Amino acid sequence: DHRDLHSFPTRRSSDLKKYFKRYHVALGNLLLLEYENGQKEAFLTARTTNGRCITSKDAALIMGEVMDGTRWSPAKDSRSIITKQYETVRFLEEGGYRMLYGASRIPKKGEKYSGDNYTFCESPGNQVVMSLSDGMGSGETAARESKQVVELTEQLLETGFSPRAALKLVNTVLLLAGPEQHPATLDLSCIDLHTGVLEAMKLGAVPTFIIGEEGVEIMEAGEVPMGILSGVEPVLMSRKLWEGDRIVMVSDGVLDALPGDDKEQAMQQYLESVEEMGPQELADQVLDFAVSFIPAPRDDMTVLTAGIWKRRS
């Protein structure tokens, strides 16, 4: 139910066939998918008619001209070249926004492995997913456990699950695995590059910080360790992101290193003082700031950052 499938409108279909014919490309079947966020995905069965090849990137440019000047690109898992044999190529309408990312981490003192795992991935519908999984404890066991949680989440998103449905399923899997499995917390930020809307989903995870024009916002959920209580709903928060907003996600080891009782406020005040910089530099600086208060890392420490900007045509 996350997308609707229908044929191209007759006139649009006719325009595409005529336009591609000018470039010596014959089109067969045309299918159009539309996601809940309004983003479109197209499947074109195509072949060249002059015995030569055309790249899917060039075909995407042709398509954009017919589709009201919108920007399209071939899907990463689709064919990169159209040849003289009919093949189906998948195209995605590009979102109005683009993102850049950064990550910085350090394991607990004395450990070779970090029990924190993170990922950045693009799921269908122009959704960018940042996930941070914090293994209970540290070292190799926690690393393996949190890696499994992150990989399962990625796989579910890639097969078309919504972020909320993916999290609920991951939580169920952990419950079935039992408490002896060193359950991990999960922090998921899903950014829709079509609309600029961020959905943050947390299961036992520490707050996320959004640096915007109005200051630094704290997005937090109540503490519920993932896989501990049955029937626990993931806490879902939503926020519209604007040009230049920056997202900062941290593992609990980062906040715990900060001075005072109100760790969130200490981080908020620090982030309000940082200058404009790239996401990777920001991630490094946040980690350096946290580490500066302790003689050695008492826990795994991870910082993820992302910045959002409007895509220029």
Task: Please report, for each region that a protein language model flagged, where it lies by residue.
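Short, small-residue-biased leader/transition segments that mark boundaries at the very start
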Residues: D1-S13
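Catalytic core of PPM/PP2C metal-dependent serine/threonine phosphatase domains
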Residues: D15-Q39, N50, D58-E87, E94, ...
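Short hydrophobic/glycine-rich mini-motifs in sensory/regulatory modules
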Residues: N37-E41, G96-R98, P124-V129, E243-R246, ...
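N-terminal entry segment of metal-dependent catalytic domains or homologous docking segments
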Residues: K84-G135, T141, Q148, P234-L236
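PP2C/PPM family metal-dependent serine/threonine protein phosphatase catalytic domain
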Residues: E93-N117, N171-A177, V206-S238
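Acidic loop->beta-strand submotif enriched in PP2C/PPM serine/threonine phosphatases
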Residues: E111-G125, P183-L186, I218-P259, F293-R298
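Active-site-proximal, acidic helix/loop segment immediately C-terminal to a metal-coordinating Asp/Glu
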Residues: G135-T159, G222-E223, L241, D245-P297, ...
